[in-house]
Amino acid sequence: MDDSTHTCQYNEEDGSMRMYIRGRPVVLYGPSDHDTLDPAKVAPPPQSKLKLEWVYGYRGKDCRSNLYLLPTGEIVYFVAAVVVLFNVDEQCQRHYTGHTDDVKCIAIHPNKMIIASGQCAGHDRLDARPHIRVWNSVSLATLAVLGSGHIERAVACLTFSRADGGSLLAAVDEGPDHTISVWEWQRPDKGHCVAETKCSVDTVVAAEFHPLDRNQIVTCGKGHIAFWTLDASNVLYKRMGIFETRDKPKYVTCLGFNHNGDVISGDSNGNLIVWGRGTNTIQKMVRGVHSGSVFSVCSLKEGAVVSGGGKDGRLVLFDADLQPTATENVIEGHYGGVRVIAEGRGSQLFIGTTKNCILHGDMELGFLPAVLGHVDEVWGLAANPALPQFVSGCWDSLLQLWDPLSHSTVWSKDIGERAQSCAWSSDGSVIAVGCVSGKWLVFDPVSREMVAHHVDGVEPIQTIQYSPDNKYVAIGSRDNFIYIYQVDDNCSRYSRLGKCLGHSSFITHLDWSEDSQYIRSNSGDYELLYWNATTCRQITSPTSMRDVVWASNNCPITFQTIGVWPENADGTDINTCTRSHDNRLAATGDDFGKVKLFAYPVTQPKSLCHQYGGHSSHVTCVRFLLDDSRLVTAGGLDTSLMQWVVE
């Protein structure tokens, strides 16, 4: 395919623009009163900009050591490519956005102000290398960028030295040798790697500098715990922990230290083991603390120790000698198991869970959620047309209603089906959810009860949209059909009018006309087709539709969105498109984690935009809230939702 994929050709005679997506020509007709276009002209970006206001979600499903409390009262954690600093008491967030792809680990400097975070390889060719960023948590200024070109695949673990005041930073990567490297991160020459060696052929899940002994590092993972020494000539050597005849675990899953400087490890057998300071031998074993793996062991200020079960969800309190106390707690199963325990103020604890929630509370009174997240791909997103609310639907079967002003979950419901798409009725009275199975369900947002249930085909329902007059709903399926239903009885009764046949690929997006008579739709092979909604017939003359006023612009392939397509677009670039209710802005989400903001209409093939990172996966849906004050974006596989203020 030549480089002229997106060379648009404008035909002055009929006011049409021919553009190519993946070599396929698409002819788009402008309104009859549209001024003649000069395709060479460059449209400026909008005056409005986006500012990241809130990030919903937390990555506890598959990452460890990812939750800490700072002296500012903020908890620090990550999701997607953002490190979040969240003050739970004051309900405010700040964000470190220096990363270009998934953040996989963080470490806190002994001064409790400096943070290191490590990422995986990125989409951007320039920033494709996995690397470590060291930054100031007060100013959010980046202090050092380390390891680009050294680190393979991703940074798995990070730890600052503690006995010497944090001059060294150790990292373990996710390459085949799980290389451990030690960095003098403050060196002016972008940090200096002082030592590097193979750590283990097996997975490494945790690494910690010893809090009292200089140049001692402990790592653990599949079938091993290793005690490392960095000697005077900067050579790393290790002694493996000796399990002797005792039942060697499949995984050593977490590390901690007691006040004497002994190492405490938790493992997949549910045991806690104390390794005497400076040795590689077992001093004490507490068996069967948890059924299933111990995912976190946390030493508290007064010397007590809390362990958390990844499977059983139990939190067990021990005294300083690792004798069990009578105190334990269990977190509710729907929040997941315990991923990490972080000590808060006083007796307070923060708990990160395996279902991407963060809970806070104490062992006596129990725990409440501070962060609720999705745990699988998020595709469904829709803004309430009547109230400042939005709803998200996910492959984890959760439907969640959010209040963007208080940044809180109004409710979360397990609908028993993997959700693919969401829509509100035009009056905001119901929420329709398209599912992966071909089912689509309708819910009352106040009672949360299901009011209707239908099935169309066995493929995912990719998009669902009510007509502006609320009399119809259109359901676009992966089976290439659009199903049209008549809507009665306050959106609780649905009767099928028919299905629209004509697309040769799956339906991706659709819009209704303002008068509720017509539908336009895009498909997986980049078609734009028009339909008479009540007859379900295709309108084969696109010129007859050029002056129709559309109630939305969710279809990215339209005359009004020509300029959102980049040069050499291969069609998979843009997953989602929307326009603001005042018709001044268009927003898109792409396969590279980018959210873009354009001035609407985007009719110039060369249109400049403002571009924003934060998501690390494909951005699956973007929607403006009803007053256009904010844009909400869904991050697909990164499981996050992000809320941006339009400034």
Model-derived regions: residue spans:
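WD40-repeat beta-propeller superdomains and closely related acidic/aromatic-rich repeat-like regions
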Residues: 2-647
